[in-house]
Regions:
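ATP-dependent carboxylate-amine ligase
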Residues: 1-145
C-alpha cells in the first residue's frame, strides 16, 4: 500500500524540483495541504498552483484565499474549471489572483508548465491542487521540467 492517489501524491522529482498533486478544491484544504508540505519540507520554497473549481465556490470564499496561501512562496492560478456551471462572465482566476498576495494568473496549463521551467529552482516544491483537470497539469509540469 503506497497511499491514496491525488492526496498529496508525490509524482516525482526532476532537476531537484518535486511535484506534488492533490485533489483539494477550497481554501481550507489548500491551507491544510500547504501546512503539511511545509512540515515535510521546512527549508524548501513551496509553490502553490490551483485550478479553481466552479465559478461560484471561489467567488463565495474569496476572502479566505490570502490566509490559505500564507505559507506559499508564490501562488499560480489557472483558468477556472467550470464543472457543472456555466461561465457567468464576471469572475475569473484573475480575480482570485488580485485578491491573493504573491499570486499570478496564468490561465493555460502549457503556459504554467513553461513558467516553472523558467522559474523553479532545485529544492523547490510545486504543489498542484484542484479537482478538475489539474492532475493533467501536474504531469505536464513534471514532464516539462
Amino acid at each position: 500500500f503506497t497511499g491514496i492517489g491525488r492526496r498529496l501524491e508525490e509524482l516525482g522529482t526532476i532537476n531537484g524540483i518535486t511535484v506534488i498533486d492533490d485533489y483539494a478544491n477550497h481554501p481550507t484544504a489548500f491551507k491544510a495541504n500547504l501546512q503539511a508540505v511545509k512540515e515535510k519540507y521546512p527549508e524548501r520554497r513551496i509553490w502553490a498552483v490551483i485550478e479553481p473549481h466552479t465559478f461560484s465556490r471561489p467567488k463565495a470564499t474569496l476572502s479566505d484565499y490570502p490566509a490559505a496561501f500564507r505559507l506559499a512562496h508564490q501562488v499560480i492560478i489557472s483558468k477556472i474549471f467550470a464543472s457543472r456551471e456555466t461561465d457567468p462572465g464576471n469572475f475569473t482566476g484573475a480575480d482570485i489572483a488580485a485578491a491573493t498576495p504573491r499570486a499570478r494568473y496564468i490561465p493555460e496549463f502549457s503556459d504554467i508548465a513553461t513558467y516553472f521551467k523558467q522559474h523553479a529552482q532545485p529544492g523547490d516544491v510545486i504543489l498542484v491542487m484542484g479537482s478538475g483537470d489539474s492532475h493533467k497539469l501536474s504531469r505536464q509540469i513534471l514532464s516539462t521540467l
